[in-house]
A protein has these predicted regions:
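Fe(II)/2-oxoglutarate oxygenase catalytic core
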Residues: 1-154, 160-187
Length: 187
């Protein structure tokens, strides 16, 4: 595994986080569950906005997978972060599938907060394949830069980073998304 930093500790990748067989198995699992439409979260709740997001999604709660991936990711995660320490991954996994013409327009990722006060601060995104054209993850500050998907690479970025999943020109893109969870430390 090798780290590539794009913007300090706010946006970075860990290459070869998963191997090709692991990625293929995740794609198989997601396809076997079946993809559906992917709404966006607004102040009015979950809404369909195909002008913003037109890819498909599968959600799967899997605490065992969260623990397994967390053990592998721990050396690469930013901790402490401000007045919090990283404690694990969100067990709600989201598999995204993007087909030609699909994208996720510029947006900020929202935080997930547990009842015990743990809160996500960073997006945890694994590229499950790279045999497609287009589909890079584009960031807009500072300046515009993009991350080209590589099979098995983990992309970690701070939720308030404005970004988009660029349109797919050909092929199908698969990603696995979760969040890095943090707990506030005592002052």
């Amino acid at each position: 595994m090798k780290k590539e930093t794009f913007h300090y500790d706010y946006v970075y990748a860990v290459h070869d986080f998963l191997n090709n067989d692991e990625c293929s198995e995740f794609i198989r699992i997601a396809e076997s569950i079946g993809f559906g439409e992917a709404p966006i979260t607004t102040s009015q709740g979950q809404v369909m906005r195909k002008d913003v997001r037109n890819n498909s999604r599968v959600m799967k709660d899997d605490p065992e997978l969260a623990d397994q991936l967390w053990r592998r990711a721990m050396p690469w995660v930013v901790t402490p972060w401000r007045s919090s320490i990283a404690v694990g991954l969100n067990e709600r996994f989201r598999f995204y599938r993007y087909e030609p013409g699909q994208r996720f327009a510029p947006h900020f990722d929202g935080a997930f907060e547990r009842q015990d006060g743990e809160k996500s601060e960073f997006t945890f995104l694994i590229y499950l394949n790279d045999d497609f054209v287009g589909g890079e993850t584009r960031f807009f500050k500072p300046g515009v830069f993009h991350v080209q998907p590589q099979t098995g690479s983990l992309l970690i970025f701070h939720h308030p980073q404005l970004h988009e999943g660029a349109v797919i020109e050909s092929g199908t893109k698969y990603v696995l998304r979760s969040d890095v969870m943090y707990r506030r430390t005592e002052a």
